[in-house]
């Protein structure tokens, strides 16, 4: 088998392992935590174009999104960038751009798995909501939330639309309107997380989960997956514009 191949940008890393699983790593070198800065979002958009091509060529069977920061997944959007928005039109444009990029993840023609080991907040939570599956570690620092309301704003990258179908309207309203984070155990009970695994063997546990996903879907041809995705998009509410 071929050895893993890797590529990197200033905020993202990417490698493909011997099982044809892509590992997309968020790891800002200039910060102790990951935030979704405008630059990082641009890099993600560009990397997704490369991924779409490699997926179409049959080089990648599944994609894992993870953090390179121990004990922290993604802290959210860039607060300074939000504060710099000077008008409602600018805010709408920034929100629409984030939604567009996250929808590209949602529409990838391979299973996508968010591997959450540590705090996952705001835009990080909205990111994982656009993945097919979510696996979280049992680390003490692992929490998932949408704290935007505490800043006087609402989730802008699709969280208000993506969360209710997963956890039900009552649970979704509680998470969005309180801004309080959810621990992995409760997240699994309400359907926000698919699996909680030991932090001590997180990568191997995620690999096992992904192998199971690939095994369950190996008989499905890409055109069938694409048709199913388009059908679901028509049935579910449209993204907030």
Question: In which residue ranges do the predicted regions lie?
Answer:
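Hydrophobic, secondary-structure "cap" segments at the distal end of domains
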Residues: 160-170
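Intrinsically disordered, low-complexity segments enriched in small/flexible residues
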Residues: 2-4, 9, 38-41, 47, ...
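Receiver (REC) domain switch/active-site residues of two-component response regulators
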Residues: 132, 193-194
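Glycine-rich beta-to-alpha active-site loop
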Residues: 68, 104-151, 155
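Hydrophobic/aromatic residues within transmembrane alpha-helices
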Residues: 65, 78, 127-128, 187
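Conserved CoA-thioester-binding segment of acyl-CoA-metabolizing enzymes
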Residues: 1-66, 100-103
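Glycine- (often His-adjacent) and acidic-residue-rich active-site loop
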Residues: 67-101, 120, 150-152
